[in-house]
Every structure is written in C-alpha cells, then in structure tokens.
Design a protein with these regions (language model features):
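Central hydrophobic cores of alpha-helical transmembrane segments in multi-pass inner-membrane proteins
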Residues: 8-23, 37-52, 89-103, 121-123, ...
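Predominantly late transmembrane helices and immediately cytosolic-facing juxtamembrane segments
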Residues: 232, 346-349, 417-449
Length: 540
C-alpha cells in the first residue's frame, strides 16, 4: 500500500464521490444518501490503511507525494502526513461518515446538492491537513469555505443568511492576511544570497529569518488561525454559525473545521517562526485563558442548547491553545489529543441536540424537563457525552485536559490555576444543563410523546461513544502516534532558543571587549539588537 499515492486517494476520493453524485437523478434520494455514505465510509477505511502503515518512530513526513504544479511560481503539489496530521485525517474521515449518516432523516430538500457539499467539504478539510506547500494549503483552506457557505446558507435556520455572511467575512479576512504572509515568506526565501524562491513548508522551516520578519509573519498567520479556532476575541461568528447550521454542518464545524486553526499553529507558526512564537507566547496564553473562562461563563446563561455547546467550544479550544503554547511535550501532546477529544465529544453533543430538535423542533432548555423517564437510552448517551465534555476520569476529555494542565504547570503555575477554574465552570454549566433537560417534572405535554433513539440513530452514536470510552481508558495508541512528531517540533523551537542564547553571549563578550578597548567597534548591530526581542516576556 505504501507504493500507492494513498494520501491523494484519501484526499480526493470524496471529490470523486461528489462527481458521481452529480450523475444520479435527484429524485433517487435513497440512492444518493447511500452513495454518499458509502464513499465517506470507504474514505475512512482507506485512511485506516494509512494509519496501519504509519511508522510511529519516524518523526518526519511519511507517504509524501510531490509533483510539479505551477512551475514558474515554484509551487508544487506536495502532500504527506506525520503523527499530528494523521490523527486529524482520521478524525475528518470518521466524522464525515457519521455526519452523512445522521442526515438521512434530517435533510429532505435538495438532498443531492447537500451530499455533494458534504463530500466537497471533506476533500477541502483533508487537503488542509496533508498539504505541505503553502499555495496548495491556501487553496484547500479557502476552497472548503464554499461548500460550508452553502451548507449553512441553504439548509440552515431562519437567520442563516446573516450567519453565513458573518462566517464567510471573518474567515476571508483572516485568509487575506495569511495570503499576504505567504507571499512575504516566498520573497524572503529567495531574496537572500543562495536563496530559493519556494512555497515548500519543509524548505521554509529551515530558514533563519530575523526576528522582525518572524514577528510580522507570525501575526499574519496567527490572526487567520485564531479566527478559525476561534480564539477570544475573534469568536463571535461561531455561535451564529452553529445555531443556524444543520446538524451535520455543526458536527463538521465543531469536530473538524475548528481544528484547522489549532493545526495551523502547530504546522506553521511554531516551526516557521519559533522566535516569534516564544515572544508572543504570553499574549496567546492569556487570550487562551480569557477564552476558557469567558466561554464557560457565557455558556452558563445560554437558553439555547446549540448556543451553549457553541460557547463551550470557545472554552475547550482555549485549553488546546494553552497546551500548544506551553511549548512542553505534555502540553502539546495533550493539546493534540484534546483536539480529537473535542471533535468527538462536541460532535456527539450536536448530534444529540439535532436528534432532539427533529422530535420537538425546539432547542430551548426551558421546553424540556423529565426526559430521562421518557427516552432512557437517549438520556444515557447524553450523560456519557456530558461527562466526557467536563473531563470525567475514565472518559476521553480527562486525558487531554490533564496533560495540558501538567504541561502548563511546568512553565506557569498561574496559567494552570486559572485554567483549572475553567474545568470547574464546565462541570457547572454542563451538569446544570443536563439536570434541567433530563430530570424534574415533565412540564410540556409535547415531551410525553417523544420516542427513544431509533436503530439508525444508535448506529450513528455507537462508534462515537465507543471512542469516547476507549480513549479515556487507553489513550496510549493516540499519544504514541504523535510522540515523535511533537518531539521534533519542540526540538526545533528549543534549538532556536539555544542559538539565540549563544548569540547573545557572543555579543555580550564582544561589547565587553570593545568597552575595554581590545576590539574595534562593529559597523552595525541593529539587527542583532532586535533579535534579542525575540525571547518571550516570561523567559521561555
């Protein structure tokens, strides 16, 4: 299998499926649904083959494929995976299949176009995670906006147009900044003695850029990624998009699309701009903490189930960002695992809320109560996912959050303490929500006639719940997958720190000699002086 272009097969198989769907008569809705699910299921199985042939001890890119694309520009079709991107590829293929299966009963209009959009979206998301050329990455990054735009704008709720335009404008604004950064990086790579104009990520990672360039480029990329995460204060598009999106759109949005932002920091910000990363670490960490606490507090007062889950994502992804910028092995590995955990837990929450909405056509918490007596299987599934979301030991949420807190505690006790408060608040708003929906008297007569989960709905939820329990009990295979890649990533950042420290020592000795009159004054030290600013404010 390693001789096959397996990464390309996984990436473009959904695109082929979308093309096949276009050939099917729109009146054959059952055939369209089965074909879409079949393509997504096969894509997931092929991605499992990718995992089965992955060498865990190899830190670099594997299954790399390279071909000339835009020769005169230096852009290539270059794809591959490492331990970080592999897990996200698996998450994408898994959740897309789940989302399509969950849409069988929920979508009744323009079914053909809906399934085409989901498959096109899958190819766009997979392309983001496997692209190793910046132009190719940007094409996938912006390309996935189009199907998501239509998913929310056509099949969304009453305020779908407002939510769609807001989502599109926010993401496009960040994309423009990133495009400027990509172009600047391209000219910096070739505009130096012996340089080569390139968009290749691996070649660009080897550049030794001055701190000023790193700082500006980091900001250009970071804003684009922070909008996608979304980090506070770039989060305002998310609740509207979630509330108006169809169930499958919310599952994909929360489960995968938001991870594109955190993945961007790991894949681009840290290796390309290590000095700027260290310098901006305190700022990003504080924004992450504000997001953790703000998201939790706002979730507590939400009357809408979907909006509550949406704001909880702001809080959970604040933990991911805090772990990444702890720049420790535990922090980064915990952040990657928590990306997977959040995709499963929050995706499952949106599935359950969607199933409830299909029965009652309302998401208001006040419209429920006492459901545990009426739909016990649904209640049990909801309980497992709720406990997972608050990080109960034995379920997946605990492992990631624990590693993030350990990694953060090693570098800043205050950060870890404030983040811990976010976990307590998460337990408050999630358990309070569960209590109001599932317990107490049945106050609405419409709730008495609710039916429990169907066989199809149980088939949708069962694999997600199984993974939630599996990761909580035995997370080692997932951590082992990312171990070598995380070590290589942090070694790059640490190497740059040591080089800067050595450079400062040499300059200090040189200045001392000049003061003592033993060495002539150098012509210009402006660049080196600015370099010293690259060290983080907290000394990391």
């Amino acid at each position: 299998m390693s001789e096959l272009p397996i990464v390309s097969i996984v990436t473009f198989l959904p695109l082929v499926g979308a093309a096949l769907l276009l050939c099917v008569d729109r009146r054959r809705e059952a055939a369209i649904k089965h074909l879409a699910f079949g393509v997504s299921a096969v894509t997931f199985l092929v991605s499992l083959g990718l995992y089965g042939n992955f060498q865990l001890d190899v830190p670099g890119m594997q299954f790399s494929e390279r071909a000339l694309w835009i020769t005169w520009l230096g852009a290539e079709y270059h794809v591959g995976v490492d331990g970080i991107s592999l897990l996200l590829v698996l998450l994408t293929t898994f959740l897309t299949a789940v989302a399509i299966l969950s849409s069988y009963a929920a979508v009744t209009t323009a079914v053909k176009e809906y399934m085409v959009c989901l498959l096109l979206l899958e190819t766009g998301m997979l392309g983001v995670f496997v692209a190793l050329d910046l132009v190719l990455f940007y094409v996938f990054w912006e390309g996935m906006l189009i199907p998501m735009y239509f998913l929310i704008g056509i099949w969304g709720g009453p305020r779908r147009i407002y939510a769609t335009i807001k989502f599109f404008l926010y993401t496009m604004a960040g994309g423009v900044l990133m495009l400027v950064g990509i172009i600047a990086l391209y000219f910096l790579s070739g505009g130096r003695p012996g340089g080569e104009y390139t968009f290749d990520l691996l070649k660009l990672s080897a550049l030794d850029l001055p701190f000023q360039a790193q700082a500006w480029l980091f900001l250009a990329f970071a804003v684009a990624f922070a909008i996608k995460v979304p980090m506070f204060p770039f989060h305002t598009w998310l609740p509207d998009a979630h509330v108006e999106a169809p169930t499958a759109g919310s599952v994909i949005l929360a489960g995968v699309l938001l991870k594109m932002g955190t993945y961007g920091f790991l894949r681009f910000a840290l290796p390309l701009f290590p000095d700027a990363t260290r310098y901006f670490t305190p700022l990003v960490s504080w924004l992450a903490i504000v997001g953790i606490l703000y998201g939790a507090l706002v979730s507590m007062v939400q009357p809408d189930l979907k909006k509550l889950v949406a704001y909880s994502s702001v809080s959970h992804l604040g933990f991911v960002m805090l772990g990444i910028f702890a720049l420790t092995v535990q922090g980064v590995e915990g952040a990657i695992l928590q990306m997977i955990n959040h995709g499963l837990s929050t995706g499952a929450l949106f599935l359950l809320v969607g199933m409830l909405y299909e029965r009652r056509h309302t998401r208001m918490i006040q419209d429920f109560g006492g459901l545990a007596r009426i739909v016990p299987i649904f209640t049990a599934a909801f309980l497992i996912v709720t406990l997972s979301s608050i990080g109960l030991p034995g379920l997946n949420g605990f492992v990631g959050e624990f590693l993030i807190l350990v990694g953060t505690f090693r570098v800043n006790v205050l950060y870890a303490a404030l983040a811990t408060a976010g976990i307590i608040l998460a337990a408050v708003y999630m358990l309070w929500m569960f209590q109001r929906v599932m317990f107490g008297p049945v106050t609405q007569e419409a709730n008495r006639g609710l039916v429990d989960l169907t066989a199809r709905e149980m088939a949708v939820l069962a694999p997600v719940l199984a993974l939630i329990v599996l990761i909580g009990i035995y997370p080692q295979p997932f951590l082992r997958t990312t171990e070598a890649s995380v070590a290589q990533l942090l070694a790059r950042v640490q190497e740059r720190k040591e080089l800067r420290a050595e450079s400062r020592e040499i300059r200090a000795e040189s200045r001392e000699r000049r003061v003592q009159g033993r060495e002539p004054r150098a012509a210009n030290w402006t660049w080196h002086a600015n370099e010293t600013e690259g060290e983080g404010r907290d000394g990391r």
